[in-house]
Amino acid sequence: MRFNELNENKMWYKTIPQILEWLESKSKMPWIWLDTETTGLGGPKQQQLTQVSAIATQYDFKNNNFSEIGTFDEKIKLTDETKSKFDEPENKTKWVLGFNHYGSGDYKYKNESDIVDDFFKWIDNYSPNILVAQNAGFDMAMLSGRYGHKITNEVFDTKMLIQLYLLPLLQALAETDTKYKEMIDFIGTSGRDNGLISSSMAKIGPVLGINMTGYHDAITDCRITIQMYQKIVELLRNNQEVDIMKYQAERIKVIRESK
């Protein structure tokens, strides 16, 4: 996959003030928050997109506020290949569609290739920009891999902010404050995080006090991701003196070993 992903190495081994400075340096251009829904997690050769959504924003870093300057939200017709899977024993496509609210809302369902083309034309309206997503690699693989579009934009994965900054901060604070220990216990661990504290938005959102109603609808998830990011930045700003290096290094070691 070819896109200029903001590789996690660029976010490794920074202090809290350094990561805040890095985020501020990116705040002059539009931030486009995006999410996709698909028929499964098998990737662009096995699954199709069912929803592509994004919110273009201007970032007021000083006040940690985002102003919406545009939205993209489209649902996609099921391909014949997808429909043919419905009758396969053990196939979970129908369950996934229900999980992702497919069929709900006042949408005109359109062809997948047209929507992907339209999406890339739409983001060009805000160039240069930075694309922001939770677990960005998956969405970028689907958007670029289905019809061969190249993603040249900078990409920022909020999952990296969680893994390398939020969670290490909570761990450091938990050493002396039971409130943060309770937050960590609520989040729990995850196999997807190689047994470390989960970086899933489904766990991080609620512990930060975010209303998750409508979660797994792409446009809703964009808004939840914005709120989650704002809460994380607020926590980081309020704890800039905390040394997170021990816990960050532990996470980086596991990320390296899992590659």
Give residue ranges: language-model regions.
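Acidic two-metal-ion nuclease catalytic site recognized across multiple nuclease folds
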Residues: R2-W22, Y180-R192, V207, I219, ...
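Catalytic phosphate/metal-binding cores of nucleic-acid and nucleotide-processing enzymes, i.e., regions
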Residues: T38-L49, Y59, N64, G145, ...
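Short acidic, glycine/serine/threonine-rich helix-capping segments at coil-helix boundaries
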Residues: N211-A218
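Active-site catalytic pocket residues across diverse enzymes, especially alpha/beta-hydrolases
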Residues: Q58, Y147, I232-L236
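Conserved non-catalytic scaffold segment of RNase H-like nuclease domains
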Residues: L6, K10-S144, T152, G195-S198, ...
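Short alpha-helix plus adjacent loop in nuclease-associated cores
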Residues: T158-D193
